[in-house]
From Swiss-Prot:
This is Zinc finger BED domain-containing protein 3. It comes from Caenorhabditis elegans. Residues 223-246, 268-283 have a biased composition (Low complexity). GO terms for cellular component: nucleus. Residues 72-81 have a biased composition (Gly residues).
């Protein structure tokens, strides 16, 4: 029995055409000159037997034919005759068979290579990139232009750079936020403009379709009424319809025409008005070829007014896409609505600026009332609190508060107090020290120095000199600067009352500067509540009877109602009121004890 080759079924070759390993071995032995019995044991393995069969020319031709048949059955254009059968061919055929249901290119092939995302090849449109330079590295990082710190950044994510500006460069962060808001407003305006233009175009198309039968009906009616004018009427109607549905080369939409139902005039008048209105509009603006078909004849003055109005509207500088619609009265309301989009956005932006300014002033007032440094604004706890309570509010840094916002608040308070002093004739004047402690501004320190010289050991001799200085300051108040004018606004009675009170308690009993500041705040509080008796009644405040020393009454009033006054200021903050500081409250208690000993 002849031994069959084990690789015949794999190659698809019939057993009759494929020689057995014994025959191949015998042939190989005969070729080598060896004689002997041939068997399968001659070869060390089945693969060696198959390899010996490949050397046969007949087998090689059969293999070539089988390979060509396989390539033809697979249908791959890249495998032609003579292409060797390899593992890649089968793998490619298997992959193609599996991906037949997918549409498109296959990832990982030469037609659709795998992309390796590396930043730097696209245009940077984000506003934050003006403060960063992109590093040409695979890590996708950016370098800050201010502090040269490397920040992780990609083309689609700028969160890291924005956080870096918010935490390290507050002013630049505010500029970026303003630029982003402006760009957002511009985009909203563009979207609104495009939407409005789309609606106007749709309405124009609808109006044109609705008005088409009117022109035809008018032409038919005129042709029936006047046989002699039928040819001219049909020509006019056809020209009107062709000009009405003429496509605008700029936008690609038909030009609008306001056509009203015809009234019962004579056929000759209607045809005349139709041709006149058409020629008039074509002479005014031949590009757009828009017209208004009037049904009744009008006077010469009304026609001139209508021509002037349409000419002004057409020559008004505006968008080319909307200029063609201004001649139609049906679209005039839409154009007015379009013009009101920009003021509405400006109003919202202006309102946000005003709200932010109010919050700035309230924070500055909190710093003044609590006597806290401006650096407290930079603490992460306060910033996170404001970020949670007011997400849209961008808090400036502590340096901005100290350099700009707090001085602005002090100037505003100074103006209000000066207006209160000048406008209230029945009120006792308030000195400038009501606004500040010893560290507010240098102008108030100068006033304190002048008043400290006033309360020296010889009070009686220096009172006359102080009176002369006040008279000179009142005479030169118009030519002095802000500091000297503020000093001259001090009332003479108030100065006399302070000098008399200091002489009463003793010139060296308390530090002069701190005492002047305390008396200024006490005078302000007493004046505020004494002019508001309904507030005193509502708060059930203790009333102090007048004494020989006015400041003694004021000091006793503030001391008796100190807790009520503090609660009132805390609940209803007012720019005209400044609360007592902690050291001033302690000094007030000592002053009251000292007055009780003297009395």
């Amino acid at each position: 029995m002849q031994t069959q080759s084990p690789f015949g079924p794999l190659l698809g070759i019939s057993s009759s055409l494929l020689p057995s390993p014994v025959t191949v071995a015998a042939a190989a032995a005969a070729a080598n000159g060896h004689q002997g019995p041939v068997s399968l044991t001659t070869f060390p393995s089945a693969f060696a037997a198959f390899a010996s069969q490949i050397r046969n020319n007949q087998l090689q031709s059969l293999l070539q034919s089988q390979i060509q048949a396989l390539n033809g059955g697979m249908g791959s254009p890249g495998n032609g005759p003579g292409t060797p059968l390899s593992r890649n061919n089968y793998a490619h055929h298997h992959q193609q068979h599996q991906n037949q249901q997918h549409v498109g290119k296959i990832r990982g092939t030469t037609e659709y290579p795998l992309r390796k995302r590396v930043g730097g090849s696209t245009v940077k449109t984000a506003k934050v990139w003006r403060y960063f330079d992109e590093l040409p590295t695979i890590e996708q990082a950016a370098e800050c232009r201010i502090c040269r710190k490397k920040i992780k950044a990609t083309n689609s994510s700028t969160t890291g750079m924005i956080r870096h500006l918010r935490s390290c460069h507050v002013q630049e962060y505010q500029l970026v936020q303003e630029a982003r808001q402006n760009s957002m407003i511009v985009k909203m305006e563009e979207k609104a403009r495009a939407k409005l233009l789309r609606e106007m175009n749709e309405k124009v198309i609808t109006n044109g379709i609705e008005n088409t039968p009117i022109v035809k009906k008018e032409s038919q009616t005129e042709s029936q009424k006047s046989p002699s004018a039928s040819s001219s009427a049909s020509d006019t109607a056809s020209s009107a319809s062709s000009s009405h549905f003429s496509t605008n080369p700029l936008i690609g939409l038909p030009a609008p025409v306001a056509i009203k139902p015809p009234a019962p005039p004579t056929p000759s008048n209607s045809i005349l008005n139709l041709s006149q209105s058409q020629n008039q509009c074509q002479n005014q603006n031949p590009m757009f070829q828009s017209q208004n078909i009037k049904n009744e004849p009008t006077d010469v003055e009304e026609e001139d007014l209508e021509q002037k109005r349409s000419r002004d509207i057409l020559h008004r500088p505006s968008d080319l896409g909307t200029k063609m619609f201004f001649s139609s009265p049906r679209t005039f309301n839409l154009t007015s609505a379009f013009s009101s989009i920009t003021p509405l956005e400006d109003h919202k932006f202006q309102k946000k600026i005003e709200d932010d300014h109010k919050i700035h002033m309230q924070i500055a007032l909190m710093l003044l009332l609590d006597q806290q440094p401006c650096q407290i604004i930079d603490r992460p706890g306060i910033r996170s609190l404001f970020k949670f309570v007011l997400p849209e509010y961008h808090m400036p840094s502590g340096d901005v508060f100290q350099a700009t916002i707090v001085p602005q608040l002090l100037n505003q308070m100074k103006q209000q107090i000066e207006a209160l002093v000048h406008n209230s004739s029945s009120l006792s004047s308030i000195p400038d020290q009501v606004m500040t402690s010893s560290s507010a501004t240098s102008s108030y320190e100068d006033v304190s120095v002048n008043e400290s010289q006033m309360a020296g050991p010889n009070v009686g001799d220096e009172e006359e000199e102080i009176m002369e200085e006040e008279v000179e300051e009142d005479e030169n108040v118009e030519i002095e600067d802000d500091t000297s004018s503020a000093s001259s606004s001090i009332d003479t009675d108030t100065c006399d009352a302070m000098a008399s009170f200091i002489h009463f308690i003793g010139n060296d009993a308390f530090p002069h500067d701190e005492l002047i500041s305390l008396l200024s705040v006490v005078t302000n509080l007493f004046t505020y509540f004494s002019t508001r008796p309904h507030v005193q009644t509502h708060l059930q405040m203790t009333i102090i009877q007048p004494t020989s020393q006015p400041l003694v009454q004021q000091v006793q009033f503030v001391t008796s109602n100190l807790s009520i006054i503090s609660d009132y200021i805390r609940q209803t903050p007012d720019m005209q009121l400044l609360p007592l500081a902690v050291n001033q409250e302690a000094m007030l208690e000592k002053l009251v004890d000292h007055i009780d000993q003297l009395v």
